[in-house]
A protein has these predicted regions:
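Hydrophobic faces of well-ordered beta-strands that scaffold small-molecule active sites
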Residues: 4-8, 32, 129-132, 152-153, ...
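Conserved, mostly hydrophobic/aromatic
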Residues: 34, 121, 143, 151, ...
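Catalytic cores of alpha/beta
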Residues: 18-21, 135-147, 176-180, 184-186, ...
Length: 195
């Protein structure tokens, strides 16, 4: 019964983006957040160390892990087919191998989005709208210009944008510049960082 916010990623298939926005309206979501701080895949060091991949690759190490964990292995082989509800109508319906969904997401996430894309989503939504990934005063001002009602200062936990400044370091200058014109939220998630 509480407020609901939908975190949106722009897709190359604009019909899918439109469909998600319309479904959120019909489902009673109160606000929308467009994520712009994850245009590159995260540096998942643990996955590199363990050899994790999607779909799983059969290596000597993974075969040993499957053999040592028979319950997990059987669950993987005989579980309900994986579905990503938001896009199930656009992928191979319930493929046992997660590759169809992963390939779709890799092909469909828009890495070249621009301010026109963001403004389109703000207008299409027509309600409270946050832009997540703002890291400069200039971008905060532009978010106001396109109609956002909130910004989220974020670098996606440092995993995607590890070389950027920390959101906390951006907070005071952004709040000083636009804090009286737009709601400013600081993303508190920090997974890692080198700076």
């Amino acid at each position: 019964n509480g407020p609901k916010l939908f975190q949106l990623y722009i897709h190359k298939d604009k019909g899918l983006t439109d469909n998600l926005i319309e479904r959120c309206k019909k489902s009673g979501f109160n606000s929308m957040c467009l994520t712009v701080d994850a245009v590159v895949a995260g540096n998942r060091e643990r996955d590199h160390r363990t050899g994790f991949s999607t779909p799983p690759r059969l290596t000597l190490s993974s075969l040993l892990s499957f053999a040592l964990h028979p319950r997990w292995s059987l669950n993987y082989l005989f579980r309900k087919k994986f579905e990503l509800s938001n896009i199930i109508h656009t992928t191979d319906k319930g493929s046992k191998i997660d590759q169809s969904v992963m390939n779709y997401m890799n092909e469909q996430f828009e890495t070249k989005m621009n301010w026109s894309d963001a403004e389109y989503c703000v207008k299409k939504w027509g309600g409270p709208f946050a832009l997540k990934g703002v890291m400069s005063v200039e971008d905060a001002k532009k978010a106001i210009d396109i109609g956002c009602t909130a910004i989220i200062i974020s670098n996606h936990g440092g995993r995607q944008l590890d070389g950027s400044r920390a959101p906390f370091d951006q907070l005071s200058e952004i709040v000083d510049a636009v804090g009286d014109k737009i709601e400013v939220i600081l993303d508190g998630g920090v997974r890692r960082g080198t700076h």
